[in-house]
Amino acid sequence: MKIINIGNKGQLSLEYILSSMIVILIISLISIPILLTAMDYSNDIIDSINSKSELSKITDAIDFCYASGKGSKRIVLVDFNRNVDIRLHNDGKRGFASINLNLSDDSKEITSYFDCNGLNEKIHLSKGFNRIAVKWDDDSNVIEVKRLI
């Protein structure tokens, strides 16, 4: 019968396993915080782009009613990822709608412009889908923007 002598070969493979685990641990400790930061920034970008797109739907509806004249009406369906307050202002020449977003690092104001200059309203929209009515009545001189329930 032949005796097989392993010697210290088992210890060598155990050292390789332990050293590779330490390297993987160090790499994960460095890469996970970087990955989480990148995910936060990408979520902020997605929220900003989505908010700008949804705000543009509302301002396009205001422009449509303004261009169509009295008696026009448009209903817009918007979808926001969070609760928002839309402020409709004007600077004397043209109007603008703005949303204040709280991002991961600071606050940012998203703005979209429209041609009508008589709106001064604030609309609260809840997270999810909301229906917005933009109408210009025949007997009114102001375009009305309100949330439909």
Task: List each language-model region with its residue ranges.
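C-terminal juxtamembrane segment of a hydrophobic transmembrane alpha-helix
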Residues: 16-17, 21-44
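N-terminal export/assembly leader peptides and their processing motifs that target proteins to secretory
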Residues: 33-149
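N-terminal leader/signal peptides at the extreme start of proteins
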Residues: 1-9
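A broadly tuned "polar low-complexity/structure-edge" signature
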Residues: 9, 17-18, 22, 81, ...
